[in-house]
Design a protein with these regions (language model features):
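C-terminal substrate-binding/active-site "lid" region of AdoMet-derived donor-dependent transferases
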Residues: 117, 124-200
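Anionic group-transfer/hydrolysis microenvironments
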Residues: 55, 76, 123, 153-154
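Surface-exposed cleft-lining segments at the edges of enzyme active sites
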Residues: 23-30, 117-126
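Class I SAM-dependent methyltransferase Rossmann-like catalytic core
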Residues: 4-48
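A short acidic, Gly/Pro-enriched loop at the edge of an enzyme's catalytic core
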Residues: 108-117
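Generic enzyme active-site microenvironment
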Residues: 51, 72, 119, 149-150
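N-terminal pre-catalytic "stem/leader" segment of glycosyltransferase-like enzymes
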Residues: 14-24, 45-66, 172-177, 194-200
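SAM cofactor-binding core of SAM-dependent methyltransferases
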Residues: 31-102
Length: 200
C-alpha cells in the first residue's frame, strides 16, 4: 500500500540542494535518502511487510505508514528518546544501541526468516560503526526474498568494499534471483548514493 505524497513533501524532495541536508526529513516524515529511492520503496513495499531498520528517524515514520511493523535500532540517545516519546505505537519497536559490538550481539536475537526489508543507514554516533558488517551479519537471519537498502554508499566512511561490487558479487551471497538498482541524484553530496537489492 503506497502512500500519497503531500505537495510539501514533493516540493522538498525536488529541491535537491535543500533535500541533501535532510533538515526537514523528520518534520515531513521522509527518509533521508535519494528521492527516487524513496519513490521506489513507496511503490514496492507492501502492508504485510516486516521491516528491520538501522538508523531511526523520518524513515521510521515514513515506513510506519506502509509496512506491518518496524524493528529499528538507533545510536543517538537523544534522538532515540525523542522518537520513542513522540511516536510510540504498537507497530514500532525502538532499540537503543551504543556500539557496533552491542548491535551485532543483539542481531543474534532477531527472528529468523521474518523480515521482508532491511535498511542499513545508522549514523556515526554508533561507536565503531561498520555498516558493511551489519549488512553481512543480517543476511543469515533474513528471508530469501528480503529487500536490502544500503544508504550513503558513495561515501568511503559508510561502505568499504561492497559498494564496488557488481550484481554478480551480491548474487553469490544472496542468490541469482536478486537484482540491484542504484540511485544517485545528488552528485554534489559526498554521502550520496542509495543501493537497493531486491528479489525478482
Amino acid at each position: 500500500m503506497s502512500i500519497k505524497f503531500t505537495e510539501q513533501q514533493l516540493s522538498y524532495m525536488q529541491n535537491a540542494r535543500e533535500f541533501v541536508h535532510g533538515r526537514k526529513c523528520y518534520e515531513l516524515e521522509l527518509p533521508w535518502m535519494d528521492k527516487d529511492a524513496i519513490f521506489w520503496l513507496n511503490d514496492n513495499l507492501k502492508p504485510n511487510y516486516n521491516c528491520l531498520e538501522f538508523g531511526s528517524g523520518g524513515s521510521t515514520l515514513f515506513f510506519n505508514k506502509i509496512v506491518n511493523n518496524i524493528n529499528t535500532f538507533e545510536a543517538d540517545k537523544n534522538w532515540y528518546n525523542m522518537l520513542r516519546e513522540k511516536h510510540n505505537n504498537d507497530k514500532i519497536n525502538y532499540n537503543y544501541v551504543y556500539s557496533q559490538n552491542e548491535l551485532i550481539s543483539k542481531l543474534s536475537n532477531l527472528k529468523k526468516d521474518y523480515y521482508d526489508v532491511c535498511i542499513v543507514d545508522i549514523g556515526s554516533t554508533l561507536s565503531g560503526r561498520n555498516r558493511e558488517e551489519i549488512f553481512f551479519k543480517c543476511i543469515p537471519k533474513m528471508k530469501k526474498t528480503t529487500i536490502y537498502v544500503l544508504d550513503n554508499g558513495l561515501s568511503k566512511h559508510h561502505y568499504f568494499n561492497i559498494w564496488k561490487w557488481k550484481l554478480k558479487d551480491f548474487q553469490n551471497i544472496l542468490g541469482n534471483h536478486y537484482n540491484m538498482i542504484d540511485f544517485d541524484n545528488a552528485p554534489f553530496n559526498k554521502y550520496a548514493g542509495t543501493r537497493i537489492l531486491y528479489p525478482l
